[in-house]
Amino acid sequence: MATNPLSILFVASEVEGLIKSGGLADVAKALPEALVNLQHDARIAIPAYTAIPDVCDDEVILDTHLETWPHTHYQVKKRFLGDNPVYLIACGHYFDRPSMYAENNQAYTDNGERFAFFSAACLDMLPKIGFQPDIVHANDWHTGLVPFLLKHRYGQDPFFAQTKSILSIHNAVFKGVFHYDEMQCLPEFHCRNVPDAAVSSTHMTMLKAGVMNADKINAVSPTYAEELKTELGSHGMAWEFQQRAGDLVGILNGCDYSAWHPDTDSYLPINYKATKQSMVRGKNGCKRALQEQVGLPIKDVAMFGMVCRLTHQKGVHYLLPVLTEFLKLDVQLVLVGTGDPLLAAQLRDVAAQFGEKFVFVEAYNNQLAHLVEAASDFFLMPSEFEPCGLNQIYSMAYGSLPIVRGVGGLKDSVCDYDVNPETATGFVFYEPTAQALLITMQRALLLYAQNLTELRRVQLYAMERDFCWNKAAEQYVELYRSALK
């Protein structure tokens, strides 16, 4: 019985290949794809944003309405993403907009209502289209009401009698907090007293609604699962995660090697494999190409890279206080990113002072992001917190040793050189200070300067690590089966 294929509906607000703003979209594509590879029936549901290319041309498989909702009419459209069926919930009132979540850096004022509608429609459509999943897998606050509604609205419905819910936490900073007045389309909130969703007497949070009602919860790394049980790590929801500790597990995200692999990466001027001769030739060629592209002197020097959003989370505030001191060493650094204008201004000032050593590219460019990974000897991720992180995994694949703070998925995926040189894949520091970061960058530079042969061995070892999605998917299947018991 345990080997029977499962049917899964993966519900998310975005998916790579259709529309994307962050890492959730990567998971929403890669995990269902890996589940199909394991012979399970995994389907995806997302809103039919008009920003999705050709969404108007998709086949309409259901034209219906949602009871109790004023903007009741919706359609379900269907297309395929590889071998995965995708259901697109179309409702012009909510999703006929230029963007997914915001315009001009202002969140849509009805986001609570929009994603409450989407969550309700995802469950409403299932008996109408005849798809009876074993598991409904929700993600982050946008779909936190899916487990809530499955329990409170559909708990006695025979169609859903065997259906269980999973909630994945990709980033607990964002909780989907809304006033009860914004939830009046849901009869479940008319009483304004919903303990398993309430954050105050006037407001509820969709994330809490999901956490308190999902059959199982997972964080996107084992360490992040532990951090969620603390006030600091959960950003104010420690009690809720502690209450559900027995149903909370951590599963490290996988890596989509079809998009991130130096042997096949079309963005690189030279491809290379995990052999010493190939790697050295490829990385040296990519380093020269990066130096030419960003205007750094062409020289054989330790190259440090960083590609990130300029936010407090990504640890730029740890780098800035020691950046000038670091750049006095024989190094080059390329930092690519956009975000906080104050951080950007400080980085521009340092770049103007150290133009021969430091380039700040205030833009996101996918080609440049790939080239930085390949050209760098070391890749900086001094994050304040990092639920999973992917760039450290990309870095290892490209032989660029990650320098990370030991939090979340960074702690779970990077092994520090000084702790165990034989199995090292990078450098780790724990103290949340700029000085701790500087010391760790100096440790890395020392290895480059004093023992290049050893550095190449560690880089090759890192390249051989395997974080494929099939491994993560097998752990998700175990989680699904535990929910069904």
Swiss-Prot record:
Gene Ontology process terms (BP): glycogen biosynthetic process
Record EC number: 2.4.1.21
Entry GO MF terms: alpha-1,4-glucan glucosyltransferase (ADP-glucose donor) activity; alpha-1,4-glucan glucosyltransferase (UDP-glucose donor) activity
Coiled coil: none
Keyword Glycosyltransferase: yes
InterPro entries cross-referenced by the UniProt entry: Glyco_trans_1 (IPR001296), GS/SS (IPR011835), Starch_synth_cat_dom (IPR013534)
Entry keyword set: Glycogen biosynthesis, Glycosyltransferase, Transferase
CDD domains documented for this protein: GT5_Glycogen_synthase_DULL1-like
Cellular component, GO, one term: cytosol
Family that this chain belongs to: Belongs to the glycosyltransferase 1 family. Bacterial/plant glycogen synthase subfamily.
Function according to Swiss-Prot or TrEMBL: Synthesizes alpha-1,4-glucan chains using ADP-glucose.
Protein name per Swiss-Prot or TrEMBL: Glycogen synthase
Protein source organism: Vibrio vulnificus (strain CMCP6)
Gene encoding the protein: glgA
